[in-house]
Amino acid sequence: MAMESTATAAVAAELVSADKIEDVPAPSTSADKVESLDVDSEAKKLLGLGQKHLVMGDIPAAVNAFQEAASLLGKKYGETANECGEAFFFYGKSLLELARMENGVLGNALEGVHVEEEEGEKTEDESLVENNDNIDEEAREELREQVYDAMGEKEEAKKTEDKSLAKPETDKEQDSEMEKGGREDMDISKSAEEPQEKVDLTLDWLTETSEEAKGGAAPEGPNEAEVTSGKPEQEVPDAEEEKSVSGTDVQEECREKGGQEKQGEVIVSIEEKPKEVSEEQPVVTLEKQGTAVEVEAESLDPTVKPVDVGGDEPEEKVVTSENEAGKAVLEQLVGQEVPPAEESPEVTTEAAEASAVEAGSEVSEKPGQEAPVLPKDGAVNGPSVVGDQTPIEPQTSIERLTETKDGSGLEEKVRAKLVPSQEETKLSVEESEAAGDGVDTKVAQGATEKSPEDKVQIAANEETQEREEQMKEGEETEGSEEDDKENDKTEEMPNDSVLENKSLQENEEEEIGNLELAWDMLDLAKIIFKRQETKEAQLYAAQAHLKLGEVSVESENYVQAVEEFQSCLNLQEQYLEAHDRLLAETHYQLGLAYGYNSQYDEAVAQFSKSIEVIENRMAVLNEQVKEAEGSSAEYKKEIEELKELLPEIREKIEDAKESQRSGNVAELALKATLVESSTSGFTPGGGGSSVSMIASRKPTDGASSSNCVTDISHLVRKKRKPEEESPRKDDAKKAKQEPEVNGGSGDAVPSGNEVSENMEEEAENQAESRAAVEGTVEAGATVESTAC
């Protein structure tokens, strides 16, 4: 039972599978048929659309349509299939028309441009522009006046510019200096009253301290004066910021050497009025009767400079010197006005107890520092006001102190210095008042001498400037190198451009032109149509030959064009009637090809045959018009078209005949010139003239032939004797003569140079002998001619 159940199950499974197989539908070719029908219909539509564009003159659209149709049919049937012949033919025809359009042979090369619309737009634009003929005389005069006014304004502007340029730059500088001088006068006038009051107070205080110093005892040893300049209350700004500087307190302390007691302390406060400080202010040393005071306004951390004074000095000299100095300072500060200068610090310094300088006094200064010496009045003298930049000769405090060793002449020297300083200050004040606001701003440059620090800074500035110049030069050299690199790049660029141009040319060469592509398409269509034996296919092949001939004419291959037209004509004569218009067209194209190839006789013959075909066609159409009374409109229209073609063809015939005549004339002229050039060297007149010339030289007295020979001896070319023999020949002759002179037999072996020289002489002698022989032969020939 189990076996039977399994067998039935297997049979049932086989039946089910068979049913399933029968239910599966068989593959059908309906889809392929639909696709093929779609391709064929699409190709036909594209062909019709392309022909429509071709008739309408839209050549690029026609080319695209025919190209797509040919590609569809080529993919389906193959490129050499019969179904593709028509598409290839029309595609090649449209490409030919496109090439003609691009070359400017027929139509406008621009796509979709209508000449009529352009002309209309031009007329509209021209109407908007004013015409010179339409302008009245009044309008012209107004325009002229406007032009003249504009020209005059331009000339005036040029003159003013020239005048402004002609002004010297000093005017501008003076203006700026005037403004600066006015500002400085305002600042000085405000601060002039305060220093005077402060000076009075300081002098009173100094007198009190001097009296106390007199009462004090001096038990031991010399005094040591240390001048300390305290830190300024405010930091000194740069000259660019132009800020004022607060006053400095100078403390003068007298100490004992070797642990001795202090005799007294003198504090001298020097009030400086606010002033504009330059970048580097010099150290001002004021010296009076052995007192050395150093004011250092620039440094923020001033140092203590001790002054060693050796020995004691009588108190009387100190008192008298202090009193005289105080009086001089009061007279100067009270009796004169403050000059308007940039830097005019007024310093009043009095030492309460200062001893005169004796021999062996030592003053410690900063190493290498020069301090310009100013007079006691403390004011900037004439150079500071007038602008005279003659510097004051710097002297160190040591030199000043050594000069004042003799106590007797100290007062006289101080007075001699104070008197001219006062006179100079008075003169400077008067000059400053006369000058007014026109004081030059360059006064500050001559007011102070340059300290060594200034020199060091100047040297540093020069070094920095040199470095900057070197940097600039380096940048310039780098820039020049970059420019050279850029120039090299620009030089390399043309090479790259040349390569690009070459590559473009190669690409253009690789890209097939429209004429070449048209030739390929038409040739392929010709092959496809020629293998078909039907009349329609053969006529298409004839048309393919015709278009191939036109392509050859466009490419100026006239021989190939004649062959193509001739093959087209042969096919058309087989399948067409004698009065068909296609024959007339072929004859016309063939005549053009002959004319381009300078075969005017054949061209005239082909044009005349074309006229015959057209006349035959007109006769046939006239007969058809007579027969068909109602439907004669089409025939009449064709007759009119043919009549319009006849004058053009006749004109071509006349042109060919005229060119033939001109060609014949040119050919005759060319032949004549060639004949004249060939016979010009052998004219009979030349020989006669030479004979007559020789005959005229004959003697008339009947002399013998020997006399004739002697008469024509001038015709014989004589040997030319060299004027100066070469040094080589002289050396050779000397070399030959030397062995004979020395007693030799002359059979000495010559050297290599002598052998070469001998060979050269022999060659020259042979050439001369040949020339003489030729001359004698010519003379004999002339004698024979004269004898005859």
From Swiss-Prot:
GO terms for molecular function: histone binding; protein-containing complex binding. Residues 116-127, 211-244, 469-512 are annotated as: Histone-binding. Component of the histone chaperone network. Binds and stabilizes histone H3-H4 not bound to chromatin to maintain a soluble reservoir and modulate degradation by chaperone-mediated autophagy. Required for DNA replication, normal cell cycle progression and cell proliferation. Forms a cytoplasmic complex with HSP90 and H1 linker histones and stimulates HSP90 ATPase activity. NASP and H1 histone are subsequently released from the complex and translocate to the nucleus where the histone is released for binding to DNA. One of its GO terms (cellular component) is nucleus. Residues 151-201, 252-278, 400-415, 721-739 have a biased composition (Basic and acidic residues). Isoform 1 is testis- and sperm-specific. TPR repeats lie at residues 43-76, 542-575, 584-617. Belongs to the NASP family. Residues 604-659 form a coiled coil. The modification N-acetylalanine is found at residue 2. PROSITE patterns: TPR, TPR_REGION. The keyword Cytoplasm applies. The modification Phosphothreonine is found at residues 123, 170, 390, 464, 477, 490, 683. Residues 114-139, 151-507, 678-788 are annotated as: Disordered. The modification N6-acetyllysine is found at residues 33, 243, 288. Residues 337-362 have a biased composition (Low complexity). InterPro entries: NASP-like, Tetratricopeptide_SHNi-TPR_dom, TPR-like_helical_dom_sf, TPR_rpt. Binds to linker H1 histones. Interacts with histones H2A, H2B, H3 and H4. Interacts with histone H3.3. Interacts with histones H3 and H4; NASP is a histone chaperone that stabilizes and maintains a soluble pool of histone H3-H4 dimers. Interacts with ASF1A and ASF1B; the interaction is probably indirect and mediated by H3-H4. Also binds to HSP90 in the cytoplasm; this interaction stimulates binding of NASP to H1-6/H1T. This is Nuclear autoantigenic sperm protein. Residues 116-139, 475-485 have a biased composition (Acidic residues). GO terms for biological process: blastocyst development; CENP-A containing chromatin assembly; DNA replication; DNA replication-dependent chromatin assembly; male gonad development; nucleosome assembly; protein transport; response to testosterone.
